[in-house]
């Protein structure tokens, strides 16, 4: 029996499968929080207050990008789950490839913008000049790995759309612990400071993305699209944006509020 068939939620009773599907989602959100928490705790303890301020002031900016990606991936997963339930595998493959191509393009553009504009953005929210060099270094490194953040969210939401919410959680937990050990190694042992903390986060996210990709290739033949990975469907992209924009903006508005408050406090 294939992995997909084992997680088919269109058959049988719904309550227990629904609870079993939901719990890993909740746990995954909790472990997602450990990334920035680990960075803040370890940097604050072993580097100093200014380094902690650099991480703290960068967090809302980083979260805006992550939440935009997460929201759009959620929109895509709604469509993918509907297509999978209807056994419309041709549309499903086009949905997957379209989301992947659009998300990678968005991630690259967003990363390049932040590499160029990190300092002006930090000044716009009135981050103290003394904290800008470290905050800008942290942001640039984090955004260089934004494509890994997208790919994990994309692959994880694709597996969830097909009924498997446990496997993405296992990879996320592994990545979260590796991030903690990476922080300790790069910050405490190598003494790379804020940059080391960002490198640890990017490396752990890259590994999480790699593990998802390997698992999908071995266990979920339906998602091994081959040349179909390069199919781009504008109409499906429009539907994805329509479904995902509400969720993305709802979450981003909270971070924008934090940025406004932060800029007022920094005045």
Give names to the regions the model predicted.
Residues 43-63, 130-134, 194-195, 236-243, ...:
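Interfacial/gating helices of multi-pass transporter permease domains
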Residues 20-39, 141, 175, 204-208, ...:
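Transmembrane helical elements of multi-pass membrane transporters/channels
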Residues 26, 30, 64, 68, ...:
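Residue-level signature of the transmembrane alpha-helical core
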